Protein backbone atom coordinates (compact mmCIF):
# COMPACT_ATOMS: atom_id res chain seq x y z
CA UNK A 1 0.00 0.00 0.00
CA UNK A 2 1.47 3.37 -0.99
CA UNK A 3 1.70 6.32 1.40
CA UNK A 4 -1.39 8.08 0.05
CA UNK A 5 -3.61 5.03 0.50
CA UNK A 6 -2.10 4.35 3.92
CA UNK A 7 -2.97 7.87 5.07
CA UNK A 8 -6.50 7.58 3.67
CA UNK A 9 -7.08 4.28 5.48
CA UNK A 10 -5.75 5.81 8.69
CA UNK A 11 -7.96 8.89 8.25
CA UNK A 12 -10.99 6.66 7.78
CA UNK A 13 -10.34 4.83 11.06
CA UNK A 14 -9.56 7.99 13.04
CA UNK A 15 -12.54 9.90 11.62
CA UNK A 16 -14.93 7.04 12.40
CA UNK A 17 -13.76 7.09 16.01
CA UNK A 18 -13.27 10.81 16.69
CA UNK A 19 -15.28 12.77 14.09
CA UNK A 20 -13.94 15.63 11.98
CA UNK A 21 -12.89 17.91 14.83
CA UNK A 22 -11.26 15.13 16.83
CA UNK A 23 -9.49 13.60 13.83
CA UNK A 24 -6.39 15.77 14.04
CA UNK A 25 -3.63 15.48 11.47
CA UNK A 26 -1.33 14.39 14.28
CA UNK A 27 -3.58 11.44 15.20
CA UNK A 28 -3.95 10.48 11.55
CA UNK A 29 -0.19 10.66 10.97
CA UNK A 30 0.43 8.43 14.00
CA UNK A 31 -2.20 5.94 12.83
CA UNK A 32 -0.65 5.88 9.34
CA UNK A 33 2.88 5.62 10.76
CA UNK A 34 4.06 8.74 8.92
CA UNK A 35 4.98 12.22 10.11
CA UNK A 36 2.71 15.23 9.68
CA UNK A 37 5.06 16.76 7.12
CA UNK A 38 4.47 13.75 4.86
CA UNK A 39 0.72 14.04 5.39
CA UNK A 40 0.68 17.71 4.36
CA UNK A 41 3.01 17.12 1.43
CA UNK A 42 0.64 14.44 0.19
CA UNK A 43 -2.69 16.24 0.69
CA UNK A 44 -1.92 19.90 1.41
CA UNK A 45 -4.48 20.38 4.17
CA UNK A 46 -6.81 18.52 6.50
CA UNK A 47 -9.80 19.66 4.43
CA UNK A 48 -8.23 18.31 1.23
CA UNK A 49 -7.44 15.04 3.00
CA UNK A 50 -11.07 14.58 4.00
CA UNK A 51 -12.32 15.49 0.54
CA UNK A 52 -10.03 12.77 -0.81
CA UNK A 53 -11.30 10.36 1.86
CA UNK A 54 -14.94 10.89 0.85
CA UNK A 55 -14.09 10.60 -2.85
CA UNK A 56 -12.19 7.36 -2.20
CA UNK A 57 -15.09 5.98 -0.18
CA UNK A 58 -17.51 6.61 -3.04
CA UNK A 59 -15.13 5.17 -5.62
CA UNK A 60 -14.80 1.99 -3.56
CA UNK A 61 -18.51 1.63 -2.82
CA UNK A 62 -19.75 -1.56 -4.50
CA UNK A 63 -23.12 -0.89 -6.10
CA UNK A 64 -24.33 -4.29 -7.30
CA UNK A 65 -26.33 -4.33 -10.54
CA UNK A 66 -29.70 -5.95 -11.02
CA UNK A 67 -30.51 -7.77 -14.28
CA UNK A 68 -32.25 -6.06 -17.17
CA UNK A 69 -34.44 -9.12 -17.63
CA UNK A 70 -35.34 -11.01 -14.49
CA UNK A 71 -35.16 -14.79 -14.29
CA UNK A 72 -35.81 -15.13 -10.54
CA UNK A 73 -36.86 -11.90 -8.76
CA UNK A 74 -36.68 -13.38 -5.25
CA UNK A 75 -33.16 -14.72 -5.65
CA UNK A 76 -31.95 -11.61 -7.47
CA UNK A 77 -33.28 -9.20 -4.85
CA UNK A 78 -32.11 -11.35 -1.95
CA UNK A 79 -28.55 -11.48 -3.30
CA UNK A 80 -28.64 -7.73 -3.94
CA UNK A 81 -29.96 -6.85 -0.47
CA UNK A 82 -27.39 -9.14 1.14
CA UNK A 83 -24.53 -7.37 -0.64
CA UNK A 84 -25.80 -3.86 0.10
CA UNK A 85 -26.34 -4.76 3.77
CA UNK A 86 -22.82 -6.17 4.00
CA UNK A 87 -21.34 -2.93 2.68
CA UNK A 88 -23.41 -0.77 5.03
CA UNK A 89 -22.47 -2.91 8.02
CA UNK A 90 -18.80 -2.83 7.10
CA UNK A 91 -18.89 0.98 7.04
CA UNK A 92 -21.24 1.40 10.01
CA UNK A 93 -18.89 3.53 12.13
CA UNK A 94 -18.00 5.86 9.26
CA UNK A 95 -21.65 6.36 8.28
CA UNK A 96 -22.72 7.00 11.88
CA UNK A 97 -20.07 9.67 12.29
CA UNK A 98 -20.98 11.40 9.02
CA UNK A 99 -24.70 11.40 9.80
CA UNK A 100 -23.99 12.61 13.34
CA UNK A 101 -22.11 15.60 11.94
CA UNK A 102 -24.69 16.35 9.24
CA UNK A 103 -25.73 19.68 10.77
CA UNK A 104 -22.14 20.88 10.96
CA UNK A 105 -20.81 19.26 7.79
CA UNK A 106 -23.82 18.47 5.56
CA UNK A 107 -21.69 17.93 2.49
CA UNK A 108 -19.87 15.01 4.08
CA UNK A 109 -23.13 13.28 5.01
CA UNK A 110 -24.51 13.77 1.49
CA UNK A 111 -21.31 12.38 -0.01
CA UNK A 112 -21.36 9.39 2.33
CA UNK A 113 -24.91 8.59 1.22
CA UNK A 114 -24.28 8.88 -2.53
CA UNK A 115 -23.69 5.13 -2.81
CA UNK A 116 -26.94 4.14 -1.07
CA UNK A 117 -28.81 6.81 -3.06
CA UNK A 118 -27.52 5.34 -6.33
CA UNK A 119 -28.39 1.85 -5.09
CA UNK A 120 -31.94 3.04 -4.44
CA UNK A 121 -32.29 4.26 -8.02
CA UNK A 122 -31.02 0.92 -9.32
CA UNK A 123 -33.61 -0.85 -7.17
CA UNK A 124 -36.48 1.39 -8.36
CA UNK A 125 -35.54 0.84 -12.00
CA UNK A 126 -35.42 -2.93 -11.44
CA UNK A 127 -38.85 -2.97 -9.79
CA UNK A 128 -40.32 -1.02 -12.71
CA UNK A 129 -38.82 -3.55 -15.11
CA UNK A 130 -40.53 -6.30 -13.11
CA UNK A 131 -43.81 -4.45 -13.64
CA UNK A 132 -43.17 -4.06 -17.37
CA UNK A 133 -42.33 -7.78 -17.65
CA UNK A 134 -45.57 -8.77 -15.93
CA UNK A 135 -43.76 -10.10 -12.88
CA UNK A 136 -45.05 -7.44 -10.47
CA UNK A 137 -48.37 -5.63 -10.01
CA UNK A 138 -48.38 -2.59 -12.32
CA UNK A 139 -50.42 -0.54 -9.83
CA UNK A 140 -47.91 -0.80 -6.98
CA UNK A 141 -46.15 2.40 -5.88
CA UNK A 142 -42.58 1.33 -6.57
CA UNK A 143 -41.00 4.40 -4.97
CA UNK A 144 -42.68 3.69 -1.65
CA UNK A 145 -41.68 0.01 -1.69
CA UNK A 146 -38.10 1.00 -2.52
CA UNK A 147 -38.06 3.62 0.25
CA UNK A 148 -39.30 1.08 2.80
CA UNK A 149 -36.65 -1.47 1.83
CA UNK A 150 -33.78 1.03 1.74
CA UNK A 151 -34.85 2.47 5.11
CA UNK A 152 -35.05 -1.01 6.63
CA UNK A 153 -31.57 -1.89 5.37
CA UNK A 154 -30.08 1.39 6.57
CA UNK A 155 -31.66 1.06 10.01
CA UNK A 156 -30.58 -2.57 10.29
CA UNK A 157 -26.98 -1.85 9.34
CA UNK A 158 -26.58 1.25 11.50
CA UNK A 159 -28.72 0.45 14.56
CA UNK A 160 -28.91 -3.33 14.98
CA UNK A 161 -26.19 -3.44 17.64
CA UNK A 162 -27.94 -0.68 19.64
CA UNK A 163 -31.57 -1.87 19.42
CA UNK A 164 -32.14 -5.34 20.82
CA UNK A 165 -34.83 -7.53 19.23
CA UNK A 166 -35.96 -4.83 16.81
CA UNK A 167 -34.60 -6.26 13.54
CA UNK A 168 -35.17 -9.68 11.94
CA UNK A 169 -33.34 -12.60 13.52
CA UNK A 170 -31.09 -14.31 12.88
CA UNK A 171 -29.06 -11.55 11.25
CA UNK A 172 -27.93 -13.91 8.50
CA UNK A 173 -31.55 -14.30 7.32
CA UNK A 174 -32.49 -10.62 7.45
CA UNK A 175 -32.02 -10.07 3.71
CA UNK A 176 -34.37 -12.92 2.81
CA UNK A 177 -36.98 -11.72 5.30
CA UNK A 178 -36.91 -8.16 3.98
CA UNK A 179 -37.27 -9.42 0.42
CA UNK A 180 -40.19 -11.63 1.47
CA UNK A 181 -42.10 -8.50 2.51
CA UNK A 182 -41.10 -6.69 -0.70
CA UNK A 183 -42.26 -9.60 -2.84
CA UNK A 184 -45.71 -9.42 -1.27
CA UNK A 185 -45.81 -5.63 -1.58
CA UNK A 186 -44.99 -5.86 -5.29
CA UNK A 187 -47.57 -8.57 -5.87
CA UNK A 188 -45.01 -11.06 -7.19
CA UNK A 189 -46.47 -14.55 -7.51
CA UNK A 190 -43.70 -16.93 -6.42
CA UNK A 191 -45.61 -19.92 -7.75
CA UNK A 192 -46.08 -18.51 -11.25
CA UNK A 193 -43.33 -19.38 -13.74
CA UNK A 194 -41.51 -16.33 -15.08
CA UNK A 195 -42.10 -17.22 -18.73
CA UNK A 196 -45.88 -17.35 -18.18
CA UNK A 197 -45.88 -13.95 -16.50
CA UNK A 198 -43.91 -12.47 -19.40
CA UNK A 199 -46.29 -14.02 -21.93
CA UNK A 200 -49.28 -12.52 -20.15
CA UNK A 201 -47.60 -9.11 -20.07
CA UNK A 202 -47.06 -9.25 -23.83
CA UNK A 203 -50.69 -10.05 -24.62
Question: Regions from the language model: what does each represent?
Answer:
Residues 186-203:
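C-terminal effector-binding regulatory domain of bacterial HTH transcription factors
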Residues 6, 48, 79, 97, ...:
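Amphipathic alpha-helical interaction segments
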Residues 51-80:
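Amphipathic alpha-helical linker/stalk segments
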Residues 20-21, 108, 136:
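Conserved hydrophobic residue
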Residues 1-18, 22-37, 41, 48:
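Basic, helix-initiating cap at the start of DNA-binding domains
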Residues 86, 90, 107-133, 143-147, ...:
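Amphipathic alpha-helical packing segments from all-alpha helical-bundle domains
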Residues 62-66, 96-98, 109-112, 139, ...:
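Short, hydrophobic secondary-structure boundary micro-motifs
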Residues 55, 77-100, 104, 109-110, ...:
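Helical hydrophobic small-molecule/effector-binding pocket
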Amino acid sequence: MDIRDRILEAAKRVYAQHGFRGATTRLIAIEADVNEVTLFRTFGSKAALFEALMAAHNAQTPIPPLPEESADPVREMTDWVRRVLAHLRENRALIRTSVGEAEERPGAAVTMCEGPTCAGRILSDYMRRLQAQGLADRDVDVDTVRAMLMSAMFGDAICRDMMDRVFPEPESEAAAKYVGIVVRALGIDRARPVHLARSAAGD
